[in-house]
Amino acid sequence: MSRPGPKPAASSRPRRGAAASHTQEHVNEKNIGSSSKPAEKKGSDEVTASSAATGTSPRMSTTGAKAVKIESEKSQSSEPPVIHEKKPKGKPKEGSEPQTLPKHASDTGSKHAHKEKALSRSNEQIVSEKSSESKTKFQDAPSADGESVAGGVTVATASDKVVVKKKEKKSLTPTLPMESTLNKLSDKSGVNAALDDLIDTLGECEDTNKDDPPYTGPVVLDPMDSTYLEALGIKEGTIPPEYRKLLEKNEAITGPLPDSPKPMGIDHAIDALSSDFTCSSPTGKQTEKEKSTGESSKAQSAGVTRSAVPPQEKKRKVEEEVMNDQALQALSDSLGTRQPDPQSHLRQAKQVKEAKAKEERQEKCGEDEDTVPAEYRLKPAKDKDGKPLLPEPEETSKCLSESELIGELSADFVQPTYQEKPSMPAAKIKKGVVPDDAVETLARSLGTRKEDPEDEKSLVDKVKEKAKEEDHEKLGEKEETIPPDYRLEIVKDKDGKPLLPKEAEEQLPPLSDDFLLDALSQDFSSPANILSLGFEDAKLSAAVSETVSQVPAPSNHTAAPPPGTERRDKELDDALDELSDSLGQRQPDPDENKPLDDKVKEKIKAEHSEKLGERDDTIPPEYRHLLDNDGKDKPEKPLTKNTEKLGQDQDPIDALSEDLDSCPPTTETSQNTTKEKGKKTSSSKASKNEEKTKDSSKKTEEVPKPKVDEDAT
């Protein structure tokens, strides 16, 4: 409280020198023979803490605090100054400065006598030297800051009474801050307090009058403390050239410094927020109040306010705010004044209106017929002769009268009053004339179809327009172009004569429409009518079997239809008649008459391989005795085989139809189909076994014909 702390403007050179000398002396004293007892360490720590507490006092920003600092510095300057001489690096002087202890140190020693008993004489000398050095530091600090002391004297004139009272009480300065700092340190370090209690139980240390032997070893030096590094910018020679230009620019600026924004209080913040809710008062009264408040504030600023000393926490906050303001001002000074924006005058200039562009109309390609290229012009459609086709006129629908419209709309609800003309019945189609399609009978009621000119052109003509026709001889069209491997070989006999092809079977006569309708509608009619049907020839029955081969016979014959269903039967008959007319006559397929042997011979070669037993030379001697018996030991062949061999010379349908006259026609058709299949298979085997067939034919001539053949003739 009584002594001010060091100012921030003081240079750091004397402090570093004092710190270096202090560390050098402390090392020498330890090497000479300082005791290492815990009681002595305790006393030294307490004295250093007290000296540090008195040396570091917080700064104050109010006028009263400045006056107290200045008066305290004056009282210190009135005391005789202590001259510090540079100590040699050799042995330090013992007991040279025991009398230079400050008054507050002696007062603290009297109050804490029970703690100082544990200190030794050698430890007292170390404490006295440290206290004297701390005193010299405090005396050097105000001497370096003489300008600040001189500036603060003018402020202290307003508080003379306070300064006089403090001069009288200078000799009796209280030691309360020291005690508070010691108590805080003792509270913070609970481990040290526990160690103090243990040390007190040991008792007082015995006084030893014997001096420790002097230290004769080498001098211990700390190279890091002895080196001095100059900070960049302390001297003018260390300032870089780039930063010198900034300093020169700042010196040339003579404008007023910007006012730092003042912190707003709670009342000002409430007034600013509540300004939107309060009603606005008249302007005349407000200006008068502002003038009166301005004059009163000026009058009050002339006098100096006297207030109590703020606590330490508030002092720290005020000092931090002052330092922040000073740092911001220093930064703002380095920036300089704001230069005017070169583009600001352009905004204020008048905008020049440009002349509107002239609109010119340009003709686009394709708007007129002249601008359309010849390649993209529409070509009119032409006939085969090259004449342009005229568009066909659209047929306009005839307007219906009101009565006709009402009749068409009310047809679903009521019988229309307007009756159309009775339509003429369509002419009956003759049975000889057959239409092209059954759908055309329905299309006649829709009207005539318009002919499209494009329909007349065939697809072949369209292809000829784009591609040229070139005749290429295909492989195999002529016998010369067929390769020898793929040429058909003529089938020859054993003698080398070519075999003549078999005569084609007799073609079936074309069937009449009535016969086909009767054959198709036999399932719909009664079974009595089925029995009445008679076939003239056996060949006709085979033709019917080809058309209706897979129709199954009805298992349950229906009874005679009731009389009410006669009309429906007639309608069905008429529909069947129309369908049968659309079918037309059946044309025979030329591929059906070809035997299967021809198809096979086209792909593979017919090679005759001699089989064992065909000649006498090839018969083994073991089986020759069978031929000598002339077939006496052979069993008789069944009649079924003979009947199958007879089918080659005689029509099988004629041979088998006599046994099946009593059966219904459906069974006959199924049996005929099976016989035809057997006929085809037998014909395929006939080419391979030609010699056997000749022998079998000779044997069949000798065998008498059965009774079935006699009945057929």
Curated annotation (Swiss-Prot):
One of its GO terms (cellular component) is postsynaptic density. Residues 351-365, 376-387, 448-505, 588-648, 687-713 have a biased composition (Basic and acidic residues). Changing G613A: 2.9-fold increase in the IC(50). Residues 1-21 have a biased composition (Low complexity). GO terms for molecular function: calcium-dependent cysteine-type endopeptidase inhibitor activity; protease binding. The modification Phosphothreonine is found at T173. There is a cross-link at K69 (Glycyl lysine isopeptide (Lys-Gly) (interchain with G-Cter in SUMO2)). The modification N6-acetyllysine is found at K86. The modification Phosphoserine is found at S57, S122, S171, S260, S281, S401, S403, S410, S445, S521, S532, S580, S582. InterPro entries: Calpastatin, Prot_inh_calpain. Keywords: Acetylation, Isopeptide bond, Phosphoprotein, Protease inhibitor, Repeat, Thiol protease inhibitor, Ubl conjugation. Residues 1-152, 253-402, 442-507, 544-713 are annotated as: Disordered. One of its GO terms (biological process) is myoblast fusion. Inhibitory domain repeats lie at residues 208-260, 341-393, 451-504, 588-641. Residues 47-64, 120-129, 275-285, 294-304, 326-346, 544-558 have a biased composition (Polar residues). Specific inhibition of calpain (calcium-dependent cysteine protease). Plays a key role in postmortem tenderization of meat and have been proposed to be involved in muscle protein degradation in living tissue. Belongs to the protease inhibitor I27 (calpastatin) family. This is Calpastatin. The gene is Cast.
